[in-house]
Every structure is written in structure tokens, then in C-alpha cells.
Amino acid sequence: MSKKVEEWSVAKRYNPFNSYKLLGQIYKWRLIKRGNPLPQPTLVTVDLQNLCDLKCIWCNSDYILKRRHQKISKKTLFEIADFLKKWLGTHHWEEGVEAVCIAGGGEALLHPDIGKFIHRLVNNGIEVGIVTNGTHLNKNLNALSKCTWIGVSVDAGTPETFKKIKGKDKFDVVINNMRHLIEYSKYHNARLSMDRPGYGLTYKYLLHPYNVNEIVQAVKIAKEIGCKNFHLRPMGIPWDKLKDSDTDTVFKSVDIKTFNRQIKEARKYESPLFGVYGITHKFGDKLNIANIFSKCYAVFMTCAIMPATDGNNDHVTVGLCCDRRGDERLELATNLDDINKLAEVWGSEKHWEIFDNIDIKTCPRCTYSEHSHIFEHVILQDSMTYKFI
């Protein structure tokens, strides 16, 4: 089996995809103890609606898109933004959530109030990042330019592969939309255009056997249109399809060799303002699942606020895992009629019961694996003797 390539060049080790940034959270996370009030998350994900205009072959929201078709109302989005500003989990930590990721469960930019929601969050002092398919990136330019980062899931280097993977011929539309937003942000000297490695637009690339030969081509496009970063990671099998899948055979040896060769070639296009990242540290040697932790402490570190299941757009459901959207076993609160009630259930007996009942063997590739690694090794075992700096 071919050895995995380095994820980033030495000069780029301080980057937004380096999980060691989580070490900055340990003084907060060490307050996570059964029976005590829990600190609120630093980051919260908000899924605005369960609707998408593409059909990616690996969609990890497919389960929820087929079963739930709601969106969160403008009224409730504003209430969420105001609640997150003041949320206080424990008096041992200052109030408020620092960042919101507007992401999955559907395509966020299709929501009619996305711009207003971004403005409300930013005005409340909360940083915003967005993951989008880019088809509607040409709308709400002013609001989008106020985000810290936007990751666009292009996942291809040619129109042909884009259509094969995503079901629609929208490659050129997405690339032009990205170019336009980058130019707009620079012209208005907006936050999105700040000269910082983690800010700006990122060309996202989920690796699949269909697109493994187009990495260099995609990197060239990303750099040419002004993206700050090219972020690649292997695709994973969605949680609801794991039973019927062999996660060890998604990528063949030839695919991994091609990936290594392509990413090494792509690094030649790096510059001080453009980075190429092939993120594999949450995967095994076959780019397969590698959830090597004993318990999921991440359920106490973040959450996803999602549309309700009762058809009322003023209500919300709160899940604890972005990789298992729609899995009721990981939902802390269903159909909340008041977002402020989230503070009451956070750290509750039900919260700990969910933690106790999670079987790691049933989990897909874990977005939050390093959260649990750090909790187990740095906080519980003090393997790094972190007080000795």
C-alpha cells in the first residue's frame, strides 16, 4: 500500500485544517464533567433548511433530505443569532458562542433569509463560515463578504466530472460565481478578502475514484480565480449506508498512488497566499474509516441546530453530530419552540445518556475524531503535560 502523502508543506503547518488548533480549547473542555454545568460550544452548526439543488453521489445528508423538507423561519433564525450571543453554559466560562458554521442538511444559500441571518450573527460579534455548493454564490454578496471563510464544494476539475458526481452541468456557473465573490470582496475590502491564510474562499474537493485524476487541474483553477486554499479530503460512506458498504474498498491502491502523485504535483502551485491541503489524518492507510477513540466527547463540544420535524418552521431540532444528521439517537432536543430551552437541556441527563449509548463502531468517518482524541489523551491522561509550556 502506498504511503500517505504529507497533508501540508512545512511552511503551511499553521492552517485552518490542522486539528492541533483544538488544543486551544482544552481549558474550556476540561470543565466537561458529569453532574456539572457544561460550557457552551465555541462553534455551533446551523442547517437552515433541508433542500438542495444538486445530487452528489456521496451526499451525507441524503437520509434527512428524503425524510425532512423543512426550513427554519427568519424569526427563529434571528432568535438563534441572539441566543448564541448570550448562551452561558457555566459561570466558569464567559458567555456566548464564538463562531457559526452554516452548512449541511441541504444547500444553505437557497434559504431566502440567509443574508439577513449572516448580518445578524456578524452584528452580534459571531464569526461566520459557510459550506456551499456554490450555485447561488452570486446572491447576497454583501452578506457573504462579511464571512470569515466560505468553502465551496466543487469536487471536480472539469465540467464533465462535476456533472458525473453532482448530477447537473453547473461547473462553469460555480467557478464564475466564486470568481465574482472574490472580486467583490476585494473591491469592498471586506472581511472575506483579508490577507490571512484561513480567510477567504476555499476550493473544496472530496476525493473519489471519479475525480482522483483531476486534482492538479482543480488546483490550477482555484489559484487562478483567487481562492486562498485548496482543501481535499477523501469522501466517506454516509452513516445510514454503512451496513451495506465495505469502507475498505472505496479507494483501490491505484487510486491512492494517483492521489499521492497528484497532490505532490499540486504543491508546486503553492504561494504565500495560496495553500494546498490534502487532509487524511482522520482516515486509515486505505483512506477508510479510522475512528480510534473510545468515547465520543465531541457531543459536548458542538451541536447542529436544524429544522424541526413537526412541520413548524418556527421550531428547531438540535442534533449532536453533523455526520449523523437525521439519526434520532443523536438528537438532544426535537421540535423546540424556544431556542433558549437549549441551554436547559445542554448537559442534562439525556445529554449524558446519548453519550453513554454511542457505539463508535457504528459511526461513519468522524469529523470530530480529533476532539475526542484530545479529550482522552490531553485532558484525561495529561499525555502532553500541557501545563508545562
Residue ranges and their predicted role:
Residues K66-V131, T135-K146:
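Conserved Radical SAM active-site core
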Residues I32-W58, E98-A103, A298-D314:
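N-terminal pre-triad scaffold of radical SAM enzymes
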Residues M1-L43, L54-W58, V318, K361-C366, ...:
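Flexible, acidic/Gly-rich N-terminal and inter-domain linker regions that tether
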Residues W346-C363:
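Immediate flanking context of iron-sulfur cluster ligation sites
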Residues C59-L65, Y368-S369:
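Detector for the c-type heme attachment site
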Residues M1-F17, D47, L65-F78, N124-E127, ...:
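Radical SAM enzyme [4Fe-4S]-AdoMet core and its adjacent flexible, acidic
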Residues C52, C56-C59, F117, L121, ...:
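Hydrophobic packing within well-folded, soluble alpha/beta domains
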